[in-house]
Structure formats: C-alpha cells, structure tokens
Amino acid sequence: MLNVSGLWAEYQGKPALQDVSLQIASGQLVVVLGPSGCGKTTLLNLIAGFMTPSAGVITLDNIPVSGPSAERGVVFQNEGLLPWRDVVSNVEFGLQLAGMSKEQRRVTALKMLNRVGLAGFEHHFIWQLSGGMRQRVGIARALAVDPRLLLLDEPFGALDAFTREQMQELLLTIWRDTGKQILLITHDIEEAVFLASELLLLSPGPGQVVERLSLNFGQRYAEGEPCRAIKSDPEFIARREYVLGKVFQQREVLI
C-alpha cells in the first residue's frame, strides 16, 4: 500500500502542496484531478522519489520513499523515450539498468509490447510512431520492471479525443489484468470520472485535497461494459457534472 500523510512541498520557492494525505491499496486506481498549477505533478514527483517534501511522510508497503526506485514505475506526459533506440530497446532500458540478461529482457520487453498492442512494431524508432503509440511504449517500459505502483503524469493530455479514449480503455484493461496500484494525474474531468476507483480533487495551488469520491465506472468497463455506454449513462453524466461544479467552485473562491 502507498501511504502519503501530511505532505507539504514547495516548487521553485513557492508553496505547491499543503497537508496532502492519500492511500492507494492493492488493485486501486486513484486519480488526482486539478487545475494547472495546483501541485499535481509535484505530488507525483514526490511519490516517485524525484523530489523531497518539506514535511510529511511517503511510504510504499511501510518502506519510506527516499529516491527513485523500480518499485515505482513512471509514465511521463512527454513519454521520456530515447529517440536513438528502437521500440523494443526502449522497453528494455530499465531492465538493462537492473542487470537482467539480454535474452531475458528481450522476452520481457516483447511480452509487454504485446500487452499494450504494439506487437510487430519492435524495431520501429520513436519518430515513426504516433502520439498514442509512443505512450503505449512508455507504459510498456514502466510495466516491464514489474513495479508495485504505476504513476502516470497526464499521459493522454496531448492526444486527440479518439486516441485518448483508446488509451483510457487500455489502462483499465492493464489495471484489471495486473491488479496493480495506479496513480494517475489529469486535468480532464471526464477522464478522471471514468478511470478512478477513487478521485481526489485538488484546490488551486498550493494544492489541498478538497473532495474525495469513490467511483465505479472504470470497474464497470473492466467487467465488460462498453466505454461509450458508460459515458452516456445518466449516472456518469451526473457525476461528471458534479465534479465540474466543484472545479468551478474552487475557481470562484480564487476570484
């Protein structure tokens, strides 16, 4: 279990997060939603071990987070892929750093590429891929090291609406099949409501958790209900509008 308790943080000398607490249990997909500048990415960077909090505690399975680790796989908004490597060697990169044999890391990388729907693209270079395909490579690379926790920082924000929905479906399929703890950062309200088993809404910076919602739309998709049927369901629309109202309420507080 990931446990974040009483987290305070600064970014470039300014307060970014204020007394943030959350937990992610095994098999839970938690989405953090908030406007630009609310500290969402700072929160992810702290959990990933890329930054150190001003105060508070972060533990994964009761072990303090003190730096980056293969226990926490990260998928970045800009993918962070290596353009001089082909697809399969990008997926192998973390395994190579971990000292896995060439043969075993190739087997693992090919398995992950098949999982994300990129079988047959192993020897393409990154510049030959669409935005959605590059994000699939990023997800495959993160999954290859078999992390306990998967962290995604607005991974679908730059994609067109059709591709974004495909990637949301892929993520839910991976969540269903692996049972991993997942934390996703987004500013897209519909995406947040669709994916989250628990949704945390952050206030404008410095970010505080102002709303927590338990949702089941992602679980419904994982159990076989079509995405379009879920998103056109009056219950889904009502939840989406409720969250939208909360977001605008926070903006009005600032004004």
Curated annotation (Swiss-Prot):
First-tier enzyme category under EC: translocase
Top-level division of the source organism's lineage: Bacteria
Its membrane topology: Peripheral membrane protein
UniProt keyword Hydrolase, yes or no: no
Chemical reaction(s) catalysed: taurine(out) + ATP + H2O = taurine(in) + ADP + phosphate + H(+)
UniProt-annotated binding residues for ATP: 34-41
Annotated SMART domains: AAA
InterPro entries: AAA+_ATPase, ABC_transporter-like_ATP-bd, ABC_transporter-like_CS, ABC_transporter_ATP-bind, P-loop_NTPase
GO molecular function: ABC-type taurine transporter transporter activity; ATP binding; ATP hydrolysis activity
Residue ranges constituting the ABC transporter domain according to the UniProt record: 2-229
EC number of this enzyme: 7.6.2.7
Similarity annotation: Belongs to the ABC transporter superfamily. Taurine importer (TC 3.A.1.17.1) family.
Descriptive protein name: Taurine import ATP-binding protein TauB
Originating organism: Yersinia pseudotuberculosis serotype I (strain IP32953)
